[in-house]
């Protein structure tokens, strides 16, 4: 039995969820990659009843035991009420909500407060400073790749985040914005900062980003100037430059000053 074709808004009810949970594999609701099951795929549904959401989180231990499911895919949801966010917060593991175009401060707080796992909300294109300040209460990665710009308030909030942050939608970052984002550079070691949408850096911006205490992802940069390479060589953890197409001898010398294994890709290829 395959997934039905989407013709109208589909609300996931308790009755439908019970059928899915009985054998999600038969109903093609398991998301897998290279034969490894990693998520319960409910992307078909654009809404979920509160009763169904409660049943879902209560069933997680059985799903994990039987199917090793830890990730919940709800990318069809277009709205997130505070009540639903409170329930989904109880899901231990990753949650994908990439269909959301916006999120209220209350819902952001309810979803993220002490939540144990990554949260994907890549569909959001605008985020208030208040919402940003609540999202940082999550205890796993935050994926916000739909954001093209960030307010100073949001940047300041994210500087306090102790976990991984993905902002791959940003295509520009001024040195002042980088200062705001990295200002708490002595905070506990975070997982990483993804800025793969940046294709070039000014020297002042590179100097600021190098102060970030965690792994720094800059895979959108294809050509690294010598002075930028020198600045980034001072980065404090692993530096990801997987988009590099060429590297001058001088730039390579600068990057080789970092400890072995802290630059990706391996510089022997340049």
Feature annotation, model-predicted:
Residues 1-41, 51-52, 57-60:
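Extended repeat-based scaffolds of very large eukaryotic assembly and lipid-transport proteins
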Residues 10-13, 20, 180, 254, ...:
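Aromatic-residue detector
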Residues 16, 49-52, 81-84, 104-107, ...:
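The leucine-rich repeat
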Residues 19-22, 90, 109, 253, ...:
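Charged/polar, solvent-exposed surface patches and flexible loops
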Residues 25-26, 31-48, 59-80, 90-103, ...:
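Concave beta-strand-loop units of leucine-rich repeat
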């Amino acid at each position: 039995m395959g997934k039905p074709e989407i013709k109208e808004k589909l609300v996931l009810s308790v009755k439908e969820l019970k059928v899915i949970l009985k054998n999600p594999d038969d109903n093609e609701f398991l998301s897998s990659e290279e034969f490894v099951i990693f998520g319960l795929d409910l992307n078909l549904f654009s809404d979920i009843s509160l009763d169904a959401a409660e049943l879902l989180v209560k069933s997680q231990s059985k799903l994990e035991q039987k199917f090793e499911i830890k990730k919940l895919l709800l990318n069809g949801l277009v709205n997130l009420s505070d009540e639903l966010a409170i329930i989904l917060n109880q899901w231990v593991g990753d949650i994908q909500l990439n269909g959301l175009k916006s999120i209220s401060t209350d819902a952001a707080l309810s979803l993220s407060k002490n939540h144990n796992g990554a949260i994907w909300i890549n569909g959001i294109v605008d985020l208030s400073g208040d919402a940003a300040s609540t999202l940082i209460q999550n205890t796993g990665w935050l994926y916000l790749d739909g954001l093209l710009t960030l307010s100073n308030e949001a940047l300041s909030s994210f500087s306090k985040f102790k976990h991984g942050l993905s902002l791959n939608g940003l295509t520009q970052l001024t040195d002042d914005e980088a200062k705001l984002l990295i200002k708490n550079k002595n905070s506990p070691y975070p997982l990483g900062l993804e800025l793969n949408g940046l294709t070039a850096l000014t020297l002042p911006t590179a100097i600021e980003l190098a102060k970030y205490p965690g792994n720094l992802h800059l895979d959108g940069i294809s050509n690294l100037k010598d002075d930028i390479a020198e600045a980034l060589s001072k980065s404090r953890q692993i530096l990801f430059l997987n988009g590099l197409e060429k590297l001058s001898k001088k730039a390579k010398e600068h990057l080789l000053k970092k400890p072995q294994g802290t630059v990706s890709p391996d510089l022997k290829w340049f």
